[in-house]
């Protein structure tokens, strides 16, 4: 696997019918916050993005990974970073997007979030007709961090509204959806250090959820 650490900033289809033809090469762009950088995993390269790339590498001759991972970034900041990255001429075959949690925590208005997400999806879709996969937001209120110290901005009602926005924009831009909203938030999947980020097991679970959507979309075999 050829790894392009272009943007891990320390601050981080085939035919219209039937299965798509499996690719020989995949240019993979992973967009997200600290989770996409592997925070919570030990080492960071055991994070969910890298686990996805490793599984792809088992089935494809060449996988080039460009992680655009910016800790604490909201969706507007990620969109701005994607705009700059796309100016380099990158043409991804696969894009994963996991954003929204930071927007919820920061108290952003859901309509503003949806506008920013639409800009992001539109920008990506303008560049690639490849596979774009986005995850929604799990129930943050069940994380140890927010059980112990509740936040008025982190409510089930707001999370549901943000997830509705993600679902609507994903449908509009032919983005496949990974539904994490119904996944139980188990303490054994969460880092003991901050009660927020996924630990090794959590990153593995997230990778598995993404791969359930990614592999068939690329015409690849399910995980063994």
What residues fall within each predicted segment?
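Cell-envelope and extracellular/periplasmic
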Residues: 69-73, 99-100
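Sec-dependent signal peptide recognition
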Residues: 1-9
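Alpha-helical cap/lid subdomain in secreted, periplasmic
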Residues: 81-223
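Serine-esterase "nucleophile elbow" of acetyl-processing enzymes
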Residues: 17-71, 84-88
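C-terminal motif of bacterial Sec signal peptides marking the signal peptidase cleavage site
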Residues: 13-15
């Amino acid at each position: 696997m050829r790894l392009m650490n272009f943007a891990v900033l320390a601050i981080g289809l085939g035919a219209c019918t039937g299965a798509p033809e499996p690719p020989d090469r995949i240019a993979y762009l992973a967009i997200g916050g600290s989770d996409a950088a592997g925070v919570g995993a030990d080492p960071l390269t055991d994070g969910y993005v890298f686990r996805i790339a490793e599984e792809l590498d088992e089935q494809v001759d060449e996988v080039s990974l460009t992680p655009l991972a910016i800790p604490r970034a909201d969706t507007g900041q990620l969109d701005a970073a994607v705009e700059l990255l796309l100016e380099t001429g990158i043409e991804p075959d696969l894009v994963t997007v996991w954003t929204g949690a930071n927007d919820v925590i920061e108290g952003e208005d859901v309509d503003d979030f949806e506008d920013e997400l639409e800009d992001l999806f539109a920008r990506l879709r303008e560049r690639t007709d490849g596979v774009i996969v986005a995850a929604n937001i799990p129930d943050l209120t069940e994380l140890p961090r927010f059980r112990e110290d509740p936040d008025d901005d982190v409510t089930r009602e707001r999370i549901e509204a943000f997830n509705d926005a993600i679902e609507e924009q994903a449908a509009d831009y032919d983005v496949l959806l990974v539904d994490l909203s119904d996944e139980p938030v188990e303490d054994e999947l969460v880092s003991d250090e901050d009660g927020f980020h996924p630990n090794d097991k959590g990153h593995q679970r997230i990778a598995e959820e993404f791969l359930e959507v990614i592999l068939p979309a690329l015409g690849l075999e399910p995980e063994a």
